[in-house]
Amino acid sequence: MTKIEDGAVVLFQGDSITDCGRNREIGTDLGRGYALIASALFASKYPEKQVQFINRGISGNRVKDLQQRWQEDCLDLNPTWVSIYIGINDTWRRYDRNDPTSVEAFAEGYRDLIVRTKETLDAKLILVEPFVLPVPEDRKRWREDLDPKINAVRELAREFETLYVPLDGMFAAASTKAPSAYWAPDGVHPSPAGHALIANAWLEAAQA
């Protein structure tokens, strides 16, 4: 049986992968990615639970951006479940804008989100690990920056006993069945098939 309770409010938080073109003017819009797919599959399987899903992902966000809007876009919404998927932009900005985020600052900011959530809400947490695939070729260089951040997220999940969605290994494994670009054309933003992978892994973590 799923861990998600009757009448739950599930909040998806993150960057462009979560945002995925959602209409900001419509508070119930879930975008076109994994948040929509996961919520649709869940709702079709558990209609009696009447679970509400909310998407507040914003394209380009880093951990520090989530920190700045956490009160309004998380705590004030009073969710019973909080799904956090952040980190790839904390790596990307080092390479495209020479604006790096140290692994220490990343972990500290992420910890702050978790602590504030736990102190304010009686909410369960799902942490989604960031991933990158080697398309185009220059993405391979990103591993030195991203890998320690992935480890930081894993350590936080262990420390706070959250649910966890291990995307990096999953996308690597999927890339043995079809080319990396099939799952994420730019190595970062998932294709529809990639979003379906995330949605299924998210539902699995929630035992749904």
Segments from the language model and where they lie:
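Short glycine-rich His-centered loop
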Residues: 2-29
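Alpha-helical cap/lid subdomain in secreted, periplasmic
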Residues: 3-6, 37-52, 61-208
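Conserved active-site regions of diverse hydrolases
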Residues: 58
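Short N-terminal amphipathic alpha-helix/helix-capping patch enriched in small hydrophobics
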Residues: 30-38
